[in-house]
A protein has these predicted regions:
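Short glycine/proline-centered loop/turn elements that form peptide/ligand docking sites
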Residues: 88, 111-114, 131-137
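Structural motif
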Residues: 98, 116, 120-121
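Conserved catalytic-core motifs of GNAT/GCN5-like acyltransferases
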Residues: 104-106, 119, 124-142
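Short hydrophobic clusters on alpha-helical segments that form packing/core surfaces
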Residues: 91-95, 103, 114
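Acetyl-CoA-dependent GNAT
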Residues: 2-81, 85-90, 94, 98, ...
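Extended hydrophobic secondary-structure segments
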Residues: 18-21, 103-111, 132-133
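Preference for well-ordered, secondary-structure-rich cores of eukaryotic proteins
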Residues: 53-54, 85-86, 102, 109, ...
Length: 155
């Protein structure tokens, strides 16, 4: 069976579907207002649609010569199908178009599956942010900071 897979700009009318995925995939999910703010500020936000259904998304922000990946998710029933890789490739291509020199992200140190996806895409572990993410038991978890070098950094 052939699937139709499209990566499209995120719009406000897609946020119900995006929020459903956010709540399903993140221990400390964004609130709808976070997505509203990102769209209002013109951040690079895309949704992956599989056969007309939102199956993933990402939001990234352009800074001075760098892009920061703010949030990224694929529904559990669409994971391990290359969708994350496809979205990352699109984000990297866009980052190159913006003349960014690097692409940055943070993720929970316990998120081994995502860590593998990012490392396979060429991201390097740069640093830890101690006690960055809240956990359901009221404690905190470290974040792994990762970077993908896109161009030659100035000396």
């Amino acid at each position: 069976m052939i699937q139709t897979i499209l990566l499209e700009p995120m719009t406000f009318d897609m946020l119900d579907a995006v929020m459903a995925i956010e709540l399903q995939t993140h221990l400390n999910p964004w609130q709808r207002r976070h997505f509203d703010d990102c769209l209002n500020h013109g951040h690079h936000a895309r949704v992956l649609q599989t056969d007309g259904v939102v199956s993933g998304y990402f939001v990234a922000m352009m800074g001075y010569e760098e892009v920061h990946l703010l949030t990224f998710a694929v529904t559990p029933d669409h994971q391990r199908r290359g969708h994350a890789r496809m979205m990352l490739e699109a984000l990297v291509a866009w980052s190159h178009e913006q003349n960014a020199r690097s692409l940055w992200l943070e993720l929970r140190v316990s998120n081994a599956r995502a860590m593998h996806v990012y490392q396979t895409a060429g991201f390097q572990k740069i640093a830890l942010r101690r006690s960055y993410y809240p956990t359901p038991d009221g404690l905190c978890e470290d974040a792994q900071v990762m970077c993908l070098t896109l161009g030659v950094c100035p000396t």
